[in-house]
């Protein structure tokens, strides 16, 4: 297990390799378990249970095994490739952006607590692009560079994974901000509004 709390973790294969990082596991199972903050950039695939119980870290990886983002409560995860089964089981917070080139991700995501949406909102697009850019800058990822170089073609293939409760809260916060409340006050009022309606 490799939890992080702050800082920046960069994992990349050594120079001169003859395999494609995006097709090979480079970090094992339960990496970033219980991570609370910081950033991780992995040029390659993670094993099973990647970012389980992540509560605030940001991670970019090029594929994950089974049970990725399980019980995640916060943070952001970008997956630039395939996932295993049962992705996002019990996920109640945070956001994941998953590249779904074969249009079959819906078969591997656990839809009990999350929805799948296209990445269309300007904030999501900017966040996704910036994280991929940072990933390429730090790891030299060929896969990341390929996606960045043709971003407008790849963007429609990404899915945003968002927990239902979290999505509802974000919408209530946005409506409070539209009424003129600033960020923190909007969050407080949204919390009370949601609690009142339970």
Regions found by a protein language model. Give the residues of each.
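Long, distal/terminal scaffolding or interaction modules
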Residues: 1-198
């Amino acid at each position: 297990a490799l939890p992080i709390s702050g800082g920046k973790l960069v994992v990349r294969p050594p120079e001169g390799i003859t395999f494609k990082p995006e097709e090979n596991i480079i970090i094992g199972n339960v990496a970033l378990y219980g991570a609370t903050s910081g950033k991780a950039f992995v040029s390659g695939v993670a094993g099973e249970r990647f970012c389980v119980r992540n509560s605030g870290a940001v991670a970019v990886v090029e594929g994950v095994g089974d049970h990725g983002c399980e019980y995640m409560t916060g943070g952001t995860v970008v997956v630039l490739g395939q996932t295993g089964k049962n992705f996002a089981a019990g996920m109640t917070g945070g956001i994941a952006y998953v590249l779904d080139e074969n249009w079959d991700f819906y078969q591997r995501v656990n839809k009990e607590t999350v929805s799948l949406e296209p990445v269309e909102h300007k904030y999501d697009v900017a966040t996704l692009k910036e994280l991929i850019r940072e990933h390429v800058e730090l790891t030299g990822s060929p896969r990341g560079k390929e996606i960045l170089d043709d971003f407008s073609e790849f963007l429609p293939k990404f899915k945003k994974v968002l927990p239902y409760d979290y999505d509802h809260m974000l919408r209530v916060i946005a409506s409070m901000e539209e009424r003129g409340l600033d960020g923190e006050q909007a969050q407080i009022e949204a919390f009370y509004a949601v609690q009142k309606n339970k």
